[in-house]
Swiss-Prot record:
Belongs to the FGGY kinase family. ATP binds at T12, T13, S14, T265, G308, Q312, G411. The keyword Signal does not apply. One of its GO terms (molecular function) is ATP binding. Inhibited by fructose 1,6-bisphosphate (FBP). This is Glycerol kinase. The gene is glpK. Glycerol binds at R82, E83, Y134, D243, Q244. Key enzyme in the regulation of glycerol uptake and metabolism. Catalyzes the phosphorylation of glycerol to yield sn-glycerol 3-phosphate. The keyword tRNA-binding does not apply. GO terms for biological process: glycerol catabolic process; glycerol metabolic process; glycerol-3-phosphate metabolic process. GO terms for cellular component: cytosol.
Amino acid sequence: MSGFVLAIDQGTTSTRAILFDGQMKVAGSGQKEFAQHYPASGWVEHDPEEIWASVVTTVKAALKNAGKAASDVAAIGITNQRETVVVWDRATGKPIHNAIVWQDRRTAPLCQKLKKQGLEKKFTRKTGLLLDPYFSGTKIAWILDKVKGGRKRAEKGELLAGTIDSFLIWRLTGGKVHATDATNASRTLVYNIAENAWDDELLAILNIPAKLLPQVKDCADDYGVTERDLFGAEIRILGVAGDQHAATIGQACFEPGMMKSTYGTGCFALLNTGSDLVRSKNRLLTTIAYRLNGKTTYALEGSIFIAGAAVQWLRDGIKVIGKAEQSGKLADEADPTQNVYLVPAFVGLGAPHWDAEARGAIFGLTRNSGPAEFARAALEAVAYQTRDLLDAMRKDWKGTSAKTVLRVDGGMVASDWTMQRLADILDAPVDRPTILETTALGAAWLAGSKAGVWPKAKEFAKSWALERRFKPEMDIATRSAKLAGWRDAVRRTLSA
């Protein structure tokens, strides 16, 4: 059997398809961006049809670029932007509304209402999550409430709902399979992570009929086969994981205590806690890292909504840079005597604050502040927010030592300046791997190992290779002063 495995990486701003060969090297790829829709303040939507078209286009491009046919591919692994939801017609496969994206804040009033009813502890105890618009459950409820006839059709069994992976699986299999994996399910706010099942009580609170939801499977499992006429041959779908979980796998963080952080649009740090379902006392999330062979591995997660998006804001919003790649060079030119802080709460603050009403702010500006100081503040904000997460993780999990090593991936980690500043602020080594396509690699490994053409976990972990380790160089006094300034800036940004 061929060792070629195709990863579909459906992200927030673009879709990528990457074909890996039997040595787990990239053989071909395709990428296509798609539109972001902002129908109201705090609202973010995607057109599911555009996402679907981007998947078909990029898969064909990856195969063409590699000079391979669909019949050469042993399996497909899917990884996706999490929490983003689609509700579609069971008969036609047509969405009844645009996908509501993970960044969307429209359900903040519903979350506040549920909090006032004293329900947050119940949701947290069962799902490991907090009552925040970030998660899928309230988004599904909103669509059913706001789309004409939505609730009635849902009760009659005419509709299906799911995260992006479920919608893609449904389309790829020609409507034969409605499924998701445990990691995506764990982000919905209605999945009991201790019992590994949809929670009837939480579904009732949000008035979501269980019949809408997909079957939950292991991350490496049988998700059906693609329709022959899509790519010219049937391809088995054997792996599915949310993007951050796939990155955890791609970084070979299989042992308790191992930690990875992905720096893309947002920043997401996951700490493997093994079979230990840790209840955070510091406003972190408890989530499923992955589920393999029926065994669940848990993680603590810190979610930061704005990381690379702050650099996009520098480029597209205030236009102080022409290209995102210029940010590190510009930051290096900043006046070291200026203490400018950017708190990038453009859509609220994530962990560990979880303040949906907070908004972005800049502190410490002087007449001499310019593009360089803005660039440095944007990049340093990523490091400061990661430090907040690491501190919370160290408080929450007894197995976390002060000798943490952070494995990093995502678009921002190509910047040496950003990675060095991250190591300085964390006071911990930061490891950048040789393969930066860790999210796609993780999805491919799930499918390839299930197909029997790629190695099992232990051998796969041995293949992880370090490109560069960034060691802390900042002195204690400077670090302490910078962190104190950051915490003061955050305090002044919080809504209450």
